[in-house]
Amino acid sequence: MPAFQAINLEPEDNIDEQIDTTKEIHVDEALKRFQHALKLHAQGPRSREAAEAAYNELFESEIFKYREAKTDYERAERYADGQPEVSNLDPSLTDGGLDVDAGGADGVAASLAQALYLSYKNYGQFFVDKFKDASTSDTAWKEKAQLKYHDDGRKVLDSWMTALDQDPSDPELWRKAARFAGAINSNRIKRYCLEAAIELDDDPAVMELDPPSLAEGMAGEQLKDQLKLLGDDMALSHPIMAPWLKKKMPALLKRHLDPIPFLPDPTKSLIPPKVSDTQAQTQEDTEMGDADNASLTEPKSVSSWAELGAKLINCLETTAEAFDTCDGIVESSLEDVPIETPPNEIESVASEIEVAVTKPTETEKSPEKDSTPKEQKAGSEGTEDSQKTADQSQKDSNGASARKRSQSAAGLPDGAEEENAMEKRSKRVRRRETLQAEETTDPNTLIANQLQPYQGADQNLFQMTKSVLEHLGVEDKSTFAFITELIDSCATENRPGKITNLAACDLSSVIVNFREEVAKVFLHKNEQASLGPSSFLEHAKTGSQDQPSMPSFNEKQGLRSFARKIGGCRSWMTAEDVAYEWVRAVSQSYATAKWSDKMKLSVVQMLNKVDSTLYRKITEEMELAAGSAERLADLETIVPMLFELHVDIYELITNPSSVVDYATRMDTKYRLGRWLDIASAYLRLIDRPANDPLIARFLWASVLVSSHAEQPLREHILLMWTSLRDHLADEKVPAISLPNNVVMPTISPAAADREISKLTTMDFFLGLFQDNMDDPVFVIDTLEPVLNPSTVCAPNQGTDSESGEDSDSSASSDTTGASTLDSSDDSTDDNDESSDASSNQKQKKSISDCASQSLKDLWKFLHNSSTELRLFLWSRLGDAYDAINYSTKKFSCCLKSIELIVSDLEGETYANTVPESRRLLFMRTLKSLDELLITALGSALNDNTAFEIIDDAHIRSTSAALAKVNCLLHVASLCEDEVRIGIKPERTGNAASKAAFQALKNKLKEMQIRAWCLQYTMFKAGINKDNCIIGPENDLADYLAAIHQVIGIRKFCKASNKIFLKVMRVELLKLKNIENWEDYLGQVLYDLHGLKLGAGVWEVQDHACPPEKLEKRQTMQLVERVCILANRMPMKDLLKSDLKTTIDHMQQTIGQTKSTPQMYHNLRNFTEYLKKPIHPLRLYRALIGDVSVDAVSVNTPETILATHGWFFLLGMMALTKFKGVELNRRQTPGATDDLRIGATFLRLQLQFTADRWDAWFRLAECFDYELDEAVLWTADKMNKERPELVKFQRNAIHCYTLALSHSRNLDIETHDGDPLHDLYHKFAMRMYASSREPFAMEPFQHSDQERYFIEDMGIGTFKRILHSQMNKYKVWKFAAKLFRMAMDRKPDNWKNPYMLSKCYWKMYQTPDDQLDVKDITSKIGLMTLIDTLKKAVEVAHNARRGRNTDPIFEPHYKIVTILHKLVIRGDVPAKDAAEILSEQPFGLEVNPDDHFASFSALEDWEEYIIRNLSKLKEKDKANWQHRIIIRHAKILFDEATEVSSEDRLVNAKAAFGVLRDSMFTKTMVMNVWKCDAERPGRHHVYTEQYVRLMTKLLVIMNDRGNLEQLLRRLRKKGADFYHFTDLWQSCCMAYLKLLRQGYNVSPVADDAFKALSSEEFEVVGERIADWAASDGAENPLFNCMKEAIEFKKLNANLMKVAPIDDLLYDCYSRIYSEIAKTLPGPDPSKVVEERHHAKEVAAQLEAAQTETKVTSSLASILNAPNGQESITGTATPMETEKQEAAPRSRKTGVRRPDVLRKAEQAVIRALEAPKPNKSRVGSVSSGKRGSRTPNQRASDAGSEEDGPDSQIRREAGHDGDVDMKDAGDENEEDHGEEEHDEENEDEQDEEHDEAAEDENAEEHGVEEKADSETGSIEDSADDESDLSDVPEDYDEEVPPGLRFSNLGHQSEESSGEDADSESEGDDEAEESDGEEEAEEEAEGEETLGIEDTELADEDEDEDEEQPKRSGSWAANDSIRAVGW
């Protein structure tokens, strides 16, 4: 949640309020109607009818359709039944989340509840009032003992029940309901209502409470009376009854105890009402109670003809049982009540018949077999009954829960209400909360929400399928009907139940009622039996194609009359006679109605059981009926039936698949023969005409009997069928249908033709079934005309088709010899046929038009044959085509087979199959379909020629068939959805069953995947520009996406080895110009490989697909699309997106690119090109696109990657990652590794595509950024490694040149910024920056690249540079051109006009003598310059983002400074310049009252300019714009202006004041920050300029103290200043000048020591040193010398020390001249003589004692008193000789180094004189320090001058400490070593160490204590952080013990020899550790920016955590020292 919320924002209108308003309207309307009804109701009996009409109108209001209008009980009952709650509300309201209780207790919900409550309450009262009217008008009313519920009593109770449901807290209404319940004699309801009336909110089990209202008190009294009447003492003991038992109701109130006194109340007494009333009551109870009791008590009886037949078969031996059965039927009342037999009640009747015939004598087992279906039915019925019972119990429990009373009814405390015991809420409020809880957990809503994604996806897919089929021209209505069913099912929850397609229903049944044996048919790969000749006839059965629909046999009709008839003949009939009569009765319906399978089975079993009886009875009847037509007519139905059924039975048991034994067959054959004779005799007796149906039936059956002879002649059978056909046709016998006979279901000429065709085509099929038929051409020629006649043409010649047995062979020969594939249908539309082909086509016609009769017979036969047979034929044809490598025709055969299967699943044969057998057939067919889908899909995907001969008609038919297949298979998904969501429970069973069920589901999912893939391939082949919806490619992509969504959300798109995902990936990569392909491809890649593209509108969904490893081949295919996506996104966003991860993964898969010779060649050319000097002409040629670099083409697999810009993309990603932090705002150096990686990929891109401009541009950027990194953070490389910087600049300029040249003729897209603008701008910036400091035109200078040229005259050569160098003016001119081009593309970028104005100004200032003729003529004018400046100011001011943002100062400052310079130059009058400035946004207006308004003098203009600068400075609140400050100072102090020394001093002080206020602190710390728009490297240039200016000002002001502090700061920050060495030298010279001036030390002309010998000088030097230790501090000359020595230590040999030594020499010389003679002591010459004398004596003594070998003892005695030699130590004889020899060799006097040595010794002696603390000698001689300083080299003296210096160092080391350390340690030695010769190394090292030590000692003396040898490392902030001064006496007195606190730390970092140039920051940080610590403690008063303080705080925190700082800390300190 946000921490605050705006209070001034008005909330938007809430849609819920609109919904509530709609509800309020409904409530208001209902209340108006209620008031109208109530008004009429109150008018009494005269308005009863009007009131009733008003109430009816009231209950038609909208509020009574709301869910709230239903009672708890109704909702519970509906939920228990699984019925969704119906609401007539607007779907938009309910979908929007309608809150029924919106508005709270007093809102709409409360009004709605009140309206419902009042309506129902008064409606019930209305009927009570009608009873009251009747009681007064009807005299018989008082005689009524009770009311009837089904009269108006039901309306009263129902209305009041609904009202109490709305408000159960109305005790008065409860009393009325109880009273009315008593009127209808319901004690139970009465008691319940009274208990509800007195049930309190507070539980009486906790505390005893009185009834809160009078109504509740009366209810309690009534309940007490009722309980006493019933004698229920247990209920009376309940605590709630206590108030009524303890207290007595007054008689006054008891009169009002009965709320409805005019109604009867039979419950007042336990005596029941009258008998008539009792009967009525019983009837009422029966009506109100369960109706199932009657059915439970009635016994099961025979209720159908089939059951009667089965019963008679069982009681053939017991006649009495047969009659008892008939008697039971007579007594039964169920006749003519239809009972539907379940479709899956019994097994196939054929198998039952076969069993019945096989064992005719086993009477004991027959009843069991017969009863099996009954038992199954009984079992199923029992299951259903148990299920119903369970459902009923569930309903009862729900109802009970809805009527459940509170726990107080049982005397138990209600724990849920204990917390609310103090707060009593109304029942209505609690009721509302219960409603809310129910609505939030409504299961129907949850189910609907879960179903919605599946429904939406399905609707989209099938609607799209329908649309595509319509556009393709499909006209199959059944296809669209099936698809429409599926689409319509998306609007319901019970989706599978809405599908009516029979095959789909079968699939649903297979899944829902799963049986493992059924699934095995589909799952197991059992080899099918090969189709042979014997099975041919079985597959060629006629079937029921022509059989008309017959009415079903009513198995109860006439059953009772038959039973009554049999019962009347009980005296003479036997059981066999009853059986005969039963057969005779059922024979009446044999030819007129369709028997059920159970009935057919009963008839066949009866024929088998009583065959002999039937034969005997029929024979007797025929004999008796001879001559009597009437009696013969009685046998008209039974005789033909018996004969025909025996034919049917014999056919069944003799088919090839029958397993009936031979004996049974022979017995059946014998019976058939007998019945043939009977039928023949009967027909002769009746003597009917030839066209009589009985004659036709007999002839047909006779032919069938003849065809089943032992060795029938085929020709004879054929002739018989032909004769029969002719007879039927000639006699015009109408078609006869025998619905109960399988073998002869239809008798007609057409059926006879089918039989004939079966015989005539037998040879044809017998040939096909031969296994040795290996000639594929013969198979094709044979089968193609039969299976696919539309594609076969016959030659237009010929021969008449023959008939008879030769017709088949002739037709075969014709088709074999002349049949060809119909090219007219299969040829493509794009190719035109030649005239010859056209003429040849005219000679042909379709085989359908000239087919022989045998061929037609084949077609007829196949039309009626089984699916397996036709599939087998198509398979043989496909195999034949495959054998001749005609794959496209094999593919066509597969498609035709699929169409065949789909057609047969919709055929009548399939529909008429028995359900159980149909499911098995369906699973077998599904298995065949799956195999065909696999074969067809493999061809469609892998064979490019698969669709070559597939014409449009073929595509339409196959697409329609596949659409049906997909609809069919989708039913499996619908069933699984129901289980997944929870509509249906998961099936239970053992592990094997579950495994089989899961295998079935997986197999179906795989089939769905394959079917959808094949459907897509068909659509792809059929869709073109003429029949597409949007566009061919868009249609296909959308269709793939729709399929993916449907199978993806169901988590099975991974099925079938992810074939669909792979197909979709390949197809999406092929399709171009499609919409939303990012979403489509992104989801596919995520499913396949787990990759996310991060683009598109949709989020990828988890489809539960395990990712596969991405291969290089697949990656190469994806590169194009990934590059397109990456190029669409801004590069910064790309680095944060999922696409970046995908790109990295792809690059890992691709791996490193191997270089080829061509790539090496290109790279070598590029490298050589970048080394070339910059040719001016090449730059200008680039503007017209005429510059390129030589490269050869590269052909490798990776070339395609470069073509799509893959390597450029990788390079841009690395480059953008480096640029992620803006260069100007970065606080640490960038990760140059990313920069180099980016450059590597860009070079790789250019090796493939050398003409890619953006690659050259970005490579130039890489060089630019590398250059910026080199100069941004430190000035080291600018000062030391300039060749590397020049290389970067040249590389960048060359790359920019090529980028500019290649981009001139291209149309550049600007989706991610404007790269072309960036090219122009950055190229111009590079050119301009290279022309200015610190680069100073060096990239354009190539004097080092000279070559020899041959002279024009002569044979000599001369050396010259390659071409003329580019001057500054040309560079500025070229840059200006680029800036103008950039302005054209981005006019709102202020930097372009700003930099253009700078270029113009530089060009404007250039003298004409430096320009060529062309440049002079086109020189920049003054107005152009000023207009450009104005433009820059305008654009920059408009670019400001808001008032609270800082303005862009650079253009404002630039126009001020340039106008000032123009005024100073005299080019622009001051007034005009002031007018221009006043027009600017930040300009200062000139008022006439201003004293400078006249601008008569230069001072007026300067004052005006200074005021302008001050205004800009005020705007710059962050103090970033240091150029404004320095410009102000330079205006005050103009170096170019000649003024007097006094004025110069005043100007200098004014300028110093400006700088001191804003730029320099009191301790001379310079605070200069790098501005955002400042070019990298310029900061160091500015700091150098500012230091030089400050130095000049301090020199003029003679401010030596500030200059000394400035030098200290400058010395520590050497890496921050451009030209630091020169800057340091100039500042040092200025400081030395001030020293001489301050102490009046002039150069000494004469050598003051020329008269002294060295020995005498030593004596004098000792005296001067002693003097310096005592009285030297008071002498100015000595102070000057001391400061000079300290300065020399600070210098640390960075500058040559000669000027410092000169000052020391001059100071010491003057001290000698002025002081030495005044010092006490003997003459120096005498002292020298005494010393010589002592040495001589010592030498003599030594020589005398040589013989005694006591040299050492004598030496100790002689040297002991020589205290003056303690400095140099005890002399050895060799040293003595050397010392004696020295005076003799040096006669010239005192040398200069000796003087300097003595001067330093005197200063050291003076510094160590007071020793308040421990001696500093120990500090200097620390072993740790000595081990870390380069003093080892001191022994290697390089020259004669090193001797005295070394002596000075030794003396300093023994006698005292150095005084100052400021310069750092090792890196300072680097400077010294670079500037001086190696002979001075010893002196440099020692002086450096001394200086460093003394500086830290001074700086740490006040604020720190030396904690350890490593010193303090808490460099928490820089000098730049605070601007306060240190105490005045800070540097005067430093405790010696603190002077070396940082000594160990300073020396352990690195050695001067090994220090890298890039580690300057480390050295600077180390140098500043001591001094800055102390300064920061005191400098707490003034700050210039917030960043320093923040940095300081951060560093302090880090210091506390890390007591020892690493090198990187020093680097950070160095960065902060720059001024960040």
From Swiss-Prot:
Keywords annotated in UniProt: Chromosome partition, Nucleus, Transcription, Transcription regulation
Listed InterPro entries: Hir3/CABIN1
Keyword rRNA-binding among UniProt keywords: no
Predominant location: nucleus
Ranges of Polar residues composition bias in the record: 389-400, 1757-1773
GO MF annotation, one: nucleosome binding
GO BP: chromatin organization; chromosome segregation
Region (Disordered) location: 264-300, 357-445, 791-845, 1757-2020
UniProt feature, compositional bias: Low complexity: 809-822, 1815-1824
Domain of life: Eukaryota
Biased amino acid composition, Basic and acidic residues: 361-378, 1791-1800, 1847-1864, 1898-1908
Location relative to the cell: Nucleus
Biased composition range(s): Acidic residues: 823-835, 1865-1897, 1915-1934, 1950-2001
Keyword Nucleus annotated: yes
Any GO CC annotation of this UniProt entry: nucleus
Residue intervals passing through the bilayer: none
Role summary: Has a role in a nucleosome assembly pathway that is required for the integrity of heterochromatin and proper chromosome segregation.
PANTHER family in the record: CALCINEURIN-BINDING PROTEIN CABIN 1-RELATED (PTHR15502), CALCINEURIN-BINDING PROTEIN CABIN-1 (PTHR15502:SF7)
Family (UniProt): Belongs to the HIR3 family.
Protein name: Histone transcription regulator 3 homolog
Species of provenance: Gibberella zeae (strain ATCC MYA-4620 / CBS 123657 / FGSC 9075 / NRRL 31084 / PH-1)
Phylogenetic placement of the source organism: Eukaryota, Fungi, Dikarya, Ascomycota, Pezizomycotina
